[in-house]
Regions:
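Glycine-enriched alpha-helix->loop->beta-strand junction motifs that scaffold or abut catalytic
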Residues: 72-77, 103-107, 136-141, 179-183, ...
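Active-site core of metal-dependent hydrolases
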Residues: 80-82, 111-121, 138-155, 182-191
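Active-site neighborhood of phospho(di)ester-bond hydrolases with catalytic His/Asp-centered motifs
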Residues: 13, 53-55, 79, 142-145, ...
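A short, flexible N-terminal coil/short beta segment enriched in small residues
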Residues: 16-25, 142-160
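H/E-rich (His + Asp/Glu) clusters that bind or coordinate divalent metals
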Residues: 149-236
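Active-site gating/metal-coordination segments in enzymes
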Residues: 6-9, 14-124
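A structural motif corresponding to the C-terminal end of an alpha-helix
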Residues: 2-8, 41-50, 137-139, 173-183
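Distinct, well-ordered alpha-helical segments
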Residues: 61-71, 89-97, 119-134, 152-176, ...
Length: 236
């Protein structure tokens, strides 16, 4: 941290266990786990360099008190990876959770679209449209990587809606006036070869620029085969 530019701070993300429908942690179905206490302790130890992001599964029996505790302890956001954690953002079970987030102003940073780096769980939970429930409760939502990989069912078209690109569903919500000031896109990982096709599209949307946030997607940026600079040249 000694080499950080003055005034720069990095958010340290916790990562909760996968939980079943009864809210029980399923450690055998979890790729990794980073406790809130660990992320918070580092942020408190080095407050000039770090802030912390909590990760609390909404099905947990202690989800609401844990959420209040995280807010009191200075968490700046909540991290979800729905498919890997077993979270359905469209579930009514999340409503009280959403109410608290909306009242506190704490945002959710949620993956959307296909997930490859952290495998397991239910990929359908990554459908960007499932996050409408949080947005409609007034929760600020940051969709990681602008949902730039994979395909999902267009639920706006009903139960038989067509399967379309996840990015197109994200873009639709970004263009809805009611989500102005609530929905944001994270542009980390857009330079990876499986997502690079969206980079130019996102940059061309100048009206989105104030709502695009820069994450690191660490540690994947250090895995060089994931990047193909020649694809940027081809896109012009």
């Amino acid at each position: 941290h000694a080499g950080f530019p003055k005034g720069a701070r990095i958010m340290l993300l916790a990562f909760d266990w996968h939980h079943d429908e009864q809210g029980r942690p399923q450690k055998e179905h979890s790729i990794f786990h980073i406790p809130d206490s660990y992320a918070a302790s580092l942020a408190h130890q080095f407050p000039a360099q770090f802030e912390w992001v909590a990760s609390i599964h909404p099905y947990r029996e202690d989800a609401i008190p844990a959420l209040h505790a995280a807010i009191k302890d200075g968490a700046r956001a909540i991290k979800w990876l729905p498919s890997a954690m077993g979270i359905d953002p469209l579930s009514p079970r999340c409503d009280r959770y959403y109410e608290i987030l909306a009242a506190s102003g704490l945002p959710i940073i949620s993956h959307a679209g296909r997930e490859l780096a952290v495998q397991g769980g239910t990929q359908d939970y990554g459908n960007p449209l499932r996050l409408r429930r949080a947005l409609d409760h007034g929760v600020r939502v940051v969709i990681a990587h602008c949902a730039s990989d994979g395909d999902d069912q267009d639920m706006d078209g009903g139960i038989n809606g067509p399967v379309v690109r996840s990015y197109d569903l994200f873009a639709r919500m970004m263009d809805e006036p009611r989500y102005q000031g609530l929905l944001f896109g994270d542009i980390s990982a857009l330079t990876q070869r499986n997502r690079a096709w969206t980079l130019k599209l996102v940059l061309q949307r100048s009206e989105w620029h104030a709502r695009l946030l820069n994450g690191s997607d660490y540690p994947l940026p250090g895995v060089m085969p994931l990047f193909a600079p020649s694809s940027f040249v081809a896109q012009g």
